[in-house]
């Protein structure tokens, strides 16, 4: 299959699945992990691969990605044994504001509430285990159905708490744009 240039593709798995040209930046995963920082701010000019880098990190660490081994098989991170063993072992929340283009405050709030509702719905399986009180399950479904948009302020923190209870591991949160 002829390799193509992946213009505009910001999803690591799509680039790998399409066998598109890719400059291996997986060494960033090791550098970032070994830094031990609680918070990392990635600043680069537009079109410098920030979103693709976040996608790569998310897909490397995420418990929910099924083909991690295959995606990263021919990359530099495969050679870093102490980091390689961490692949697919963390809950990951990923949020992007790139589609939030509203100019009115109330519309912006509703749009963000919708994005967070999508994230909550992806993790609906959390409500099936006995890790939440009935009140917490109500809270979860209120966020998932956008019934309480004013609660979005603490919703990511609450979701990360639920994920921590479920997996017993700290949660990686990626926020883009």
Regions found by a protein language model. Name each.
Residues 38, 91, 168-172:
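Loop/turn-to-beta-strand initiation segments
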